């Protein structure tokens, strides 16, 4: 959900920021240098789509996190489902935070591959963001079929007496406040330290829980230390340490009505019938009185017409809370050997995430349905690469990459509603009374296995270890046939060794006795399926030709790969549903990059086409047969989702432009479209309560989109500056973005309407750029979008 923002920013600078366009009489666009190819290169010379957003652009348009990047870059969508989970859509493919499989999009901070939740933390003191669209099967650390996001933070500057510190403060509606600061400390001529930090607080979308009186709130704190040491012109050593913590309370808003008749009406009618039969002697005395204990949820505080998503109202008993803490250590060594350049990268990242939710979003259960997921992740990466610098004819990069990822997740639920709903005055669940959270209850049960034997509770405690070790060798060669024509090819050989397990522990209680499995630990993944070893080969081939020194035409082909895997299901389902095979893709991109009008106009355009074999899709809320010790059980809804493999095709267009109108005005924008569909004969899983089979409900998805990505999106920006008669200069910035209407992936009958966002920033800065004050309004039309639907 988006909302109107009315914000005031005061920025104190002690250095002149960099701008992405020239601000002098020459009226030319500045060269944009990126490292998408693992070396510094003009983005106009790269034979693939790369959208670069400079740090000054992020500051100028008040872009604070990835979810706002789509305002200046089309063809990408960034959505925070909740503070623990986030999705990214690029070229029609979607990163799923709950997938457990290789993702089509990978995020990086300073070349360190991270989980989506870490990449989605608020950006600050950022040098630039590079959005690499298309398959990344050669040079990037992790193979990703749809693209990659590279975030580069500012490093300490060595040997410069320039002061580049700043303090920024911001206040906004919805109780939003932000303080950001950074500065270099020059210790010696060869050693500098940069310190940066951010503190942010807000009430988000101001969702309110009318049952618990708890309102939405978010707090984010982060600090970063960057050390740069350059003992000689040949050697550069950088070390960065970042620590961040997010703490959020986020009630989940609902939409809808009670329906006709309501649950309360049905139950009251049933009780009155029992009372009537009791009066006639056909039912035992006291039958109606016993049923009076049955919980009947009432919604007297909800309007007769029901609730809309824009009302921002939550109804659940438990208060959802998310906490995420992360640490990143990153060592970067670069050595210029004359004919070659050596780069070494070592990183270690740790993440602890806790998510407490109430799965009873509608507030139908008197004590709710609490679930707690805790995930601890540790990732170590090593990368070594060497590039030649002594030949204008043949350029190459050869390297080794290693990534060791260890993840441990617990997913704990209190399912005592089976008895508390019948007699809430007599029975209470574990969570909210004896224990604060499901994880605390499960830990207590493991520590003292028989301590809950007399309690009328039902707890399920899941442990999911997931380890992966990736080792890869890669090489990329560029051969300049002439001054105008080049060919480029690369390959990557990788091996992925994995381990996964899923163990369900059922604490012994009065309702879950030893005879029904209480006290047991049940492995959900067979021992033969716990270990995996996968090899893959991916690569690229590119041809580029310069029509002149300002226009490049190119054709690129690149392959992608996603490993086979096993569905991690919260319930026991038919084993035949669990496995999915590897995905292989071939992407072709045909593009043009050009600079015109003596450097005042830049236009880049590309057409892309994917052919994907065994595309991995996860289907949520699937109706499937549950299996118990006794055999097939009831048909239930699988919340975690089940994977399928189907062939698919994706194609589309990316266009971006920038134009210097005059010395005071610059404008630009981008447009993207994508068309994706499953091949003929494709089968997906479905939510069908009428299903009576022994596996899972299915549906024909032939010709339907592979995700709920918008088919078209565009944005436009304009920056106008004029001298202020009282000194300094005034500026006005306009930013408009639009995203097409789309169909919900959960319910094909639900349409997510087109989203139109308009932002305006006005400000005044001093002539020497020492200070800057601005006022801005985001979403000035107060347009509202459903960014995520959970069914």
Regions found by a protein language model. Give the residues of each.
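Gram-negative outer-membrane beta-barrel transporters
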Residues: 389, 395-396, 480-487, 606-611, ...
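C-terminal beta-signal and adjacent terminal beta-strands/loops
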Residues: 618, 667, 735-745, 764-791
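Outer-membrane beta-barrel translocator/receptor signature
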Residues: 103-104, 124-127, 133, 138-223, ...
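Membrane-embedded beta-barrel scaffold of Gram-negative outer-membrane proteins
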Residues: 332-337, 341-347, 352-357, 546-562, ...
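Outer-membrane beta-barrel domain signature, strongest for Gram-negative TonB-dependent receptors
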Residues: 212, 218-397, 403-405, 602-604
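Solvent-exposed loop segments that connect transmembrane elements
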Residues: 207-214, 251-314, 358-371, 412-463, ...
């Amino acid at each position: 959900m988006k909302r109107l923002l009315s914000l005031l920013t005061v920025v104190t600078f002690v250095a002149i920021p960099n701008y992405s366009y020239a601000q002098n009489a020459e009226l030319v666009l500045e060269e944009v240098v990126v490292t998408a190819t693992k070396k510094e290169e003009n983005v106009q010379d790269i034979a693939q789509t790369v959208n670069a957003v400079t740090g000054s652009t992020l500051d100028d348009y008040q872009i604070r996190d990835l979810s706002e990047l789509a305002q200046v870059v089309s063809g990408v969508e960034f959505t925070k489902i909740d503070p623990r989970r986030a999705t990214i859509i690029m070229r029609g493919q979607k990163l799923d935070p709950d997938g457990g499989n290789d993702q089509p999009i990978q995020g990086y901070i300073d070349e360190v591959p991270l989980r989506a939740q870490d990449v989605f933390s608020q950006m600050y003191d950022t040098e630039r963001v590079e959005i690499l669209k298309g398959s990344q099967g050669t040079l990037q650390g992790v193979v990703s079929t749809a693209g990659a996001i590279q975030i580069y933070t500012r490093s300490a500057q060595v040997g410069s007496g320039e002061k580049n510190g700043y303090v920024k403060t911001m206040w906004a509606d919805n109780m939003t406040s932000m303080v950001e600061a950074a500065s270099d400390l020059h210790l010696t001529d060869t050693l500098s330290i940069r310190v940066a930090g951010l503190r942010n607080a807000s009430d988000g979308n101001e969702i309110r829980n009318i049952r618990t009186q708890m309102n939405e709130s978010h707090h984010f704190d982060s600090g970063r230390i960057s050390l740069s040491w350059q003992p000689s012109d040949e050697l550069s050593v950088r070390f960065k340490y970042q620590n961040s913590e997010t703490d959020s309370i986020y009630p989940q808003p609902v939409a809808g009505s009670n329906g006709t008749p309501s649950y309360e009406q049905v139950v009251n009618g049933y009780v009155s019938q029992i009372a009537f039969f009791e009066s006639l002697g056909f039912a035992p005395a006291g039958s109606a009185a016993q049923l009076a204990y049955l919980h009947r949820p009432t919604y007297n505080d909800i309007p007769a017409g029901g609730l809309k998503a824009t009302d921002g109202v939550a109804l659940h008993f438990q208060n959802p809370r998310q906490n995420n803490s992360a640490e990143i250590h990153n060592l970067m060594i670069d050595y210029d050997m004359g004919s070659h350049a050596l780069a070494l990268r070592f990183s270690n990242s740790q993440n602890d995430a806790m998510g407490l939710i109430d799965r009873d979003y509608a507030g139908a259960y008197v004590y709710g349905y609490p679930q707690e997921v805790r995930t601890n992740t540790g990732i170590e990466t090593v990368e070594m690469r060497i590039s030649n610098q002594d030949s204008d004819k043949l350029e190459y990069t050869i390297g080794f990459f290693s990534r060791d990822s260890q993840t441990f997740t617990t997913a704990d639920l209190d399912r005592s509603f089976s008895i508390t709903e019948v007699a809430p005055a007599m029975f209470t669940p574990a969570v909210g009374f004896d224990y604060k959270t499901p994880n605390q209850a499960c830990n207590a049960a493991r520590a003292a296995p028989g301590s809950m034997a007399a309690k009328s509770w039902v707890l399920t405690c899941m442990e999911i270890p997931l380890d992966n070790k990736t080792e890869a060798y890669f090489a990329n060669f560029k051969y300049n046939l002439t001054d105008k024509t080049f060919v480029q090819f690369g390959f990557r050989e990788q091996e992925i060794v994995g381990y996964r397990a899923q163990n369900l522990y059922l604490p012994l209680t009065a309702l879950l006795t030893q005879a029904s499995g209480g006290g047991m630990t049940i492995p959900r993944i067979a021992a033969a399926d716990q270990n995996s070893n996968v090899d893959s080969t991916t690569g690229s081939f590119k041809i580029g030709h310069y029509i002149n020194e300002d226009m490049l035409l190119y054709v690129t082909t690149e392959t992608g790969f996603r490993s086979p895997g096993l569905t991690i299901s919260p319930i026991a389902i038919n084993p035949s549903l669990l496995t999915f095979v590897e995905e292989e893709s071939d992407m072709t991109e045909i593009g043009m990059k050009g600079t015109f009008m003596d450097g005042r106009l830049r236009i880049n355009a590309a057409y892309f086409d994917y052919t994907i074999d065994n595309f991995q899709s996860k289907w949520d809320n699937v109706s499937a047969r549950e299996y118990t010790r006794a055999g097939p059980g009831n048909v239930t809804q699988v919340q975690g989702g089940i994977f399928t493999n189907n062939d698919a095709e994706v194609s589309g267009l990316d266009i971006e432009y920038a134009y210097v109108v005059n010395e005071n005005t610059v404008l630009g924008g981008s447009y993207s479209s994508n068309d994706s569909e499953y091949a003929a004969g494709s089968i997906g899983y479905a939510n069908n309560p009428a299903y009576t089979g022994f596996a899972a409900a299915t549906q024909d998805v032939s010709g339907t989109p592979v995700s709920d990505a918008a088919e078209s999106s565009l944005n436009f920006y304009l920056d106008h500056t004029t001298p202020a008669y009282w000194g300094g200069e005034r500026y006005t910035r306009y930013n408009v973005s639009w995203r097409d209407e789309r169909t919900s992936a959960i319910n094909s009958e639900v349409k997510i309407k087109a989203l139109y966002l308009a932002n305006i920033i006005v400000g005044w800065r001093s002539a020497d750029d020492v200070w800057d004050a601005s006022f801005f309004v985001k979403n000035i039309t107060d347009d509202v979008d459903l960014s995520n639907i959970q069914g």
